[in-house]
């Protein structure tokens, strides 16, 4: 069985300074019961929400997420978001990004998109752990929405080697100091790269921070949000800053 490349993320306590939650949320006392509300609006969003930066992206920006209870926890919702592999060719091949939503437990304010960093850590797992990560006022007022960035997790993951091949590659000499060892090292690296290309296809060339940030704007539109309310940790702050540079008028 093949294994996607994994990068262990550090779940930092520092939150993104670039895109902040700027809304006050009324909390409840611990003794007050809470019920799961309908987490997202059912009416179509205004045209200003789904307006695409490029006319060729209009269909993708108008998509709505079909949420269903997650298999792992039916209290959470799972879905997918369709994005182009290459934004320079918006009518070309597409991939689906994995999404997970923890519905607001109280009076809903909106959606909060989160990313744990890495780069490459699964945002769906981060959102699923929301109760252990975020304070109660945030959980009451916001749907916590996580996504696996393109090329990671369940979002068209980059794939290279089988488990056995990866073990053999990692067991190689990382510091070659003879001509023979240098040649062996070079051959193994080239083979690794070639297998990544063969197994992953065109998505391998499109797993950049800029493309992940553009994916977040498609997600904002699909969530029916006029502006993106976002919280990132570690590398997630870079992703948030990149989004703010690309879409300054869409920052919440």
Report each predicted region and the residues it spans:
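C-terminal region of N-terminal signal peptides and the immediate post-cleavage residues
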Residues: 16-47
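Charged, compositionally biased non-catalytic regions
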Residues: 4, 12, 25, 41-56
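Gly/Pro-rich cap/lid or specificity-loop segments adjacent to the active site
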Residues: 48-252
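Secretory targeting and sorting signals
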Residues: 1-23, 81, 216
